[in-house]
Amino acid sequence: DDAVANGVHAISGVVDS
């Protein structure tokens, strides 16, 4: 999954806290 600056994975859509 590509983690974006906002912490959201663009592919899986999982949010990184």
UniProtKB/Swiss-Prot annotation:
Tissue: Expressed in skin glands.
Gene Ontology CC terms: extracellular region
UniProt superkingdom: Eukaryota
Alphabetically ordered keywords of this record: Secreted
Its biological purpose: May act as an antimicrobial peptide.
Recorded family membership: Belongs to the Frog skin active peptide (FSAP) family. Septenin subfamily.
Record's protein name: Septenin 1g
Species this chain originates from: Osteopilus septentrionalis (Cuban treefrog)
Phylogenetic classification of the source organism: Eukaryota, Metazoa, Chordata, Craniata, Vertebrata
